[in-house]
């Protein structure tokens, strides 16, 4: 009996069911973000304010967690020193896949005004960053808008297609 290998990647087409699965899974992921806060300086104060009742991140599905094993989003806010770099890398590695990182504020994005031997000039030199929030210190509304942008990015992800294509090859 002849066996034919089906090439699903031909013409860019995978089974149609994966598109629906992607939408459902990404909708669930985007509306249940568990964020681990890593507040290091002034931006940490604004991040704490965003967790209060006035901004109510819970209505967007974002819940702040203290453990990296319970989180899928890391929010790095403030100046990252070289001594902290090892710890932030370890915390990032403890997070389960899929995971995202938000860099909040000028100091986390580029090192800010602290261009010294002891500071890391941007979190993206240690861990991959998905979203940069500018400002010194960014207001809670900026973080709220950033979470909404991250949700939009997650909904556009094609995770199951990449996983199936990897298994079929």
UniProtKB/Swiss-Prot annotation:
Q: Which reaction does it catalyse?
A: a quinone + NADH + 5 H(+)(in) = a quinol + NAD(+) + 4 H(+)(out)
The organism's place on the tree of life at top rank: Bacteria
Name the SUPFAM superfamilies for this protein: HydA/Nqo6-like
> Which Pfam families does the UniProt entry name for this protein?
Oxidored_q6 (PF01058)
What EC number(s) is this enzyme filed under? 7.1.1.-
Q: Identify the GO cellular component terms for this protein.
A: plasma membrane; respiratory chain complex I
Is this entry keyworded Secreted?
no
Residues recorded as binding [4Fe-4S] cluster, renumbered to this chain, are 42-43, 107, 136
User: Which purpose does this protein serve, as stated in its record?
Assistant: NDH-1 shuttles electrons from NADH, via FMN and iron-sulfur (Fe-S) centers, to quinones in the respiratory chain. The immediate electron acceptor for the enzyme in this species is believed to be ubiquinone. Couples the redox reaction to proton translocation (for every two electrons transferred, four hydrogen ions are translocated across the cytoplasmic membrane), and thus conserves the redox energy in a proton gradient.
Q: Subunit info?
A: NDH-1 is composed of 14 different subunits. Subunits NuoB, C, D, E, F, and G constitute the peripheral sector of the complex.
- The identity of this protein, by name, is NADH-quinone oxidoreductase subunit B
């Amino acid at each position: 009996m002849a066996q034919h290998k089906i090439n699903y990647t031909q013409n860019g087409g995978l089974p149609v069911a994966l598109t629906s699965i992607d939408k459902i899974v990404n909708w669930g992921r985007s509306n249940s973000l568990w964020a681990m806060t890593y507040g290091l300086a002034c931006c940490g104060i604004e991040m704490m304010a965003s967790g209060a009742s006035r901004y109510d991140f819970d209505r967007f599905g974002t819940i702040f967690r203290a453990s990296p094993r319970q989180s899928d989003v890391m929010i790095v806010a403030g100046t990252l020193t070289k001594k902290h770099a090892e710890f932030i890398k370890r915390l990032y590695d403890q997070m389960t896949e899929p995971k995202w990182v938000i860099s909040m504020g000028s100091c986390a994005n580029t090192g800010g005004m602290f261009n010294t031997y002891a500071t890391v000039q941007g979190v993206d030199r240690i861990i991959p960053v998905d979203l940069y929030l500018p400002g010194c210190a960014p207001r809670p509304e900026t973080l709220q808008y950033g979470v909404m942008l991250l949700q939009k990015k997650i909904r556009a992800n094609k995770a199951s297609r990449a996983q199936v294509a990897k298994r079929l090859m």
